[in-house]
Amino acid sequence: MPASEPATLPVLAAQAAVLARRLPEVAEVWGRGRLDPKLREQVMLAVAHANACRWCTYAHRQWALAEGVTDAELAALEDERSEAFDRRTWAAIAWAQARAHADLGPAPDELERELARHFDASERADLDLVTRAMTAANVSANTFDALLSRLRGRPVAHSRLVDEVAIGAGVALAIPPVAAYLMLWRRRPPRLLARELRTLHAAR
């Protein structure tokens, strides 16, 4: 997994403002399933891995499995390999990964053209929304990780304490309900979930 990048308050605020203006689309994509849920989770997991977010990668592995993503597809997503996917699915994954690697800048022209071959303008807008939302969550969780690193005496280069405290506090509040949801929805016993999270923490 590549190195994770923390967020700054101004950058995250700008991302949040874009998402706030698109709340009706959020309701359609997540609430009403306008974008195929399996494809949505494949894209979100690919973006989480591109952004090196261990927390989001862990959580979205569980959601992806629930939506029918196979273990082989999970492995291919994390290795950025195309052979496990049809051309349409891979066009979305590769495009989203490129956007994540470019800090939400444009993807290379060939990826933009390939995406347009398989998705209409409305679908491309939905994929953009998913990529933006996942990136905002990823960099927030990475900033929480930067705070944990600072507390262990290993501050992350170019990461500011004020960003870590403000953003990390929000992430810390979100972790317990997400963990509870995973325990109930995925029927993961608390002891197993705690062991997996400890392993995740030790990997940092």
Task: Explain the meaning of each model-derived region.
Residues 1-204:
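Hydrophobic alpha-helical segments
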